[in-house]
Amino acid sequence: MIPGELVTGDGEHELNAGRRTIELVVANTGDRPVQVGSHYHFHEVNDALSFDRAAARGFRLNIAAGTAVRFEPGQTRTVELVELAGARAVYGFQGKVMGPL
């Protein structure tokens, strides 16, 4: 299996159906590349990334599982985030939440 690979039946399949998404402009203000994985709580990513962190609370990148987005130094790009599902509790990462959202 390949990271992010989906093995499905015939027909159309919508991922993250019914989940709220937002777009944010993100700038890497640091001097090193920053890579963010598919399921990382975006609110808690590397502090060198500049964006509206409050808006990103409870969201992750809306990309295939097992993949990542790389932000080069000085790069600005728009990303789509999708709302976290399940119990909507966040533990670990940078320890900024450590409980229910």
Swiss-Prot record:
Q: What class of enzyme is it?
A: hydrolase
The pathway it acts in is: Nitrogen metabolism; urea degradation; CO(2) and NH(3) from urea (urease route): step 1/1
What GO terms are given for molecular function? urease activity
An annotated GO BP:
urea catabolic process
Top-level division of the source organism's lineage = Bacteria
Record-linked CDD domains: Urease_beta
Q: Where in the cell is it found?
A: Cytoplasm
Q: Does the keyword Hydrolase apply?
A: yes
Query: Got a GO cellular component term for this one?
Result: urease complex
Primary location class: cytoplasm
Q: Which reaction does it catalyse?
A: urea + 2 H2O + H(+) = hydrogencarbonate + 2 NH4(+)
Recite the UniProt keywords alphabetically: Cytoplasm, Hydrolase
Membrane-spanning residues: none
State the EC number(s): 3.5.1.5
- What subunit structure does UniProt give? Heterotrimer of UreA (gamma), UreB (beta) and UreC (alpha) subunits. Three heterotrimers associate to form the active enzyme.
Q: Which family does it belong to?
A: Belongs to the urease beta subunit family.
Instruction: Identify this protein by name.
Output: Urease subunit beta
Organism whose genome encodes this protein? Burkholderia thailandensis (strain ATCC 700388 / DSM 13276 / CCUG 48851 / CIP 106301 / E264)
| Taxonomic classification | Bacteria, Pseudomonadati, Pseudomonadota, Betaproteobacteria, Burkholderiales
